[in-house]
Amino acid sequence: MTDSVGGAFFGRQIPFLELIGARAEHWEKGRAVVSVDVRPELTNSWKFAHGGVVLTLLDVAMGAAARTTDAKGHGIVTVNITVNFLRSSSGLLRAEGRVLRGGRSLVFCEGDVKDVSGETMAIGIGTFRLKKRDGDAK
């Protein structure tokens, strides 16, 4: 299953992801892959991917993986993310999020970001809360 992250990932518009050009490549129960082509406006002063872009990819990939565990279609909000930046990179970046454990309201995930050569540039862990949206059916 694939879709545009900003366009309709899980049927939701996410304007910030449209702005940076993030794309959903794949999602299945407990796993999601998201990518972005690092344009000049997404780089730091050394012309590598800005750390905020890398963190965003991890947040989206892990959050999307967490969301795949919920049969009720709740939204996801980030409770906590810890990221370790291992190396700098640019070009196409791909983040994979994986569920470690899920419960009724919290989902624990891990993820990594790799560059086009397959080198890992960042790893992270995150906690996500399943949250009913106002107006959604129970």
Question: Where in the sequence are the language-model features?
Answer:
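Terminal targeting signals and extreme-terminal segments of soluble enzymes
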Residues: 1-138
